[in-house]
Every structure is written in C-alpha cells, then in structure tokens.
Amino acid sequence: MARFDSLADSVGHTPLIGLPKLSPSPTVRLWAKMEDRNPTGSIKDRTALSMLDAAEKSGQLQPGATILEPTSGNTGISLAMAAKVRGYRLICVMPENTSPERRELLEMWGAKIISSPAAGGSNEAVRVAKELAAQNPEWGFLYQYGNPANTAAHYNSTGPEIFEDLPTITHFVAGLGTTGTLMGAGAYLREKNPDIQVIAAEPRYGELVYGLRNIDEGFVPELYDASVLTRRFSVGAEDSVRRVRDLLEVEGIFAGISTGAILHAAIAIGNEAVREGKSADIAFIVCDGGWKYLSTGVYGANVDQATEGLDGTLWA
C-alpha cells in the first residue's frame, strides 16, 4: 500500500483497469483510467492542484488570498478542498440550477457560492466570473478554461501514467469540457507514439450531456487545440445514461454521467476496430464517481425516465 506525506501528494497515481466484459473482443480491449480514486472523487483534483501550484509559483496567489472560479461541479469541489488545506478563501460562480450535491460539497469545504442565471448555463457563469475578476483584481482568478496549468496537469501526470501502464495503447478517449485532459494527456501520448489516436467525446449538437460541451455551440475554451485530436465523436444524452448503467451492471464500476458518454465513444471506436480486423488497446477516462449523482435517479429508473429526470439541473 502506498504512503503519502499529505492528501495533496495522493492525487493521481490512479489505477488503469481492464473491462473484459464490455471490451468488443479479446484483441480489442477497453481500459478505464479510474480518476474517481482521487481524494474528492474526480479527475479535477489534478487540475486544481496544478493551477494552485502555478499561481503560487508566479506570485498570483499570496497567503490568505481569495480565489475565484466559474464552475458547475468537480473543479470547484477540488479547489475547495485544496483551498481549505492551503488557507485560501474560495468563491465559486455557479449556475443557479446546479445540483444540490455540488452546493453541499462546496459549502462543506467552506466555499462561498455566487449564483448565475440558469438559462445561460456554464457559459453565463464564466461571463459573471470574468466581470467579478475585473471588479476585484486582487482576487486570484484561476480560470480553468484558459489556464495552461490545467493542460500541464495532464501532460505531466495523466498521460505519463497511462503510457507507463499501457505502452501498447492505440486510442485515448476523454470528454470535451475544459479540454485540459484531452490537450494535455493527448499531446503527451502522441509525442510518445504519433500513431495513437486521440478522440474527444462531445454532446450531440443541441443535446445536453452533463460535464461536456459541444464547441460548435458557441464557447470554445482557450485551451482547445484541434491539432491534438484525431476526431470528435458525438454522443447523445440517452447514450450516456445507458452506458454509465452498463458500466455499473456489467463491470461493477460506479461512475458519473459524463463517463457514460466517454465509454459510448470508446465502445464505438472498438467496434470499428473489430470490423476492420484490427487489434486495439483503448484507454478512456472515468471522470468521477457515481455517488455524486444518486439523486438523479440515473441508476435506478428506466433509461427514458432517467434521461428525462436530468432535464433542468446541472449535475457535473
């Protein structure tokens, strides 16, 4: 069993687990990078610590400073944990329809929440946060969508961990959100082997898949670099729900909703390889644990009811 000097030191080092039952064939294997094993239960612990370390090193954050961040979920929770440990005050701008779990977790770690109008979603939260940052220049505005430390977190840790554990990797699949995971881990993996395909799972245009975004709908994160990607794969809300339930029922992995979208893309890529007579090792990200989504009913209702039950509330 590994020993760490502090909670922050335990971030990362997550297992890569094979999915023998969901893999399309014995020669086309799926591998789950279990980011739910991080301290707050999501991959965003890597991002939060990387952004804090960079801000401290640059002098952007002084002891006792106030941190500002737009978020509808995991990044805020990760920052709240890290800010509490390091003695910072955190203000999160969140859409007013963000799920109760998110608000309760943030408040538990001492974060202050400023609500933005629900109609604008996370894009409106970003706009409000930028206004507040301009009005309060003494605050540390980390801004995950444009912070190079977000990408660096995955270039320096997530990507190397995957390649060390799976040197035969042929495909890497992750969700399109801030794009930090895809840009960082994807760039690292393609440097190690240019033949590795990097696939972004994104919501089908006009559909809502929680925690992900379709960049054709108006907001393109500053971190996004299309040259890192091999392709973008569109996923519907129902696909996400169905696959996250498959992951639980078939492989026993209890993951969050966006992971269902990523798994759906990974399985489709695997099926393509089978049809083409190719072997493949496909690594994908399990973004967070399903315990943050219990009140959605996703894991108990039928698929149609579960999909409808997500409408109107941000769960990631």
Placement of each model-derived feature along the sequence:
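PLP-dependent amino-acid enzyme catalytic core
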Residues: 1-316
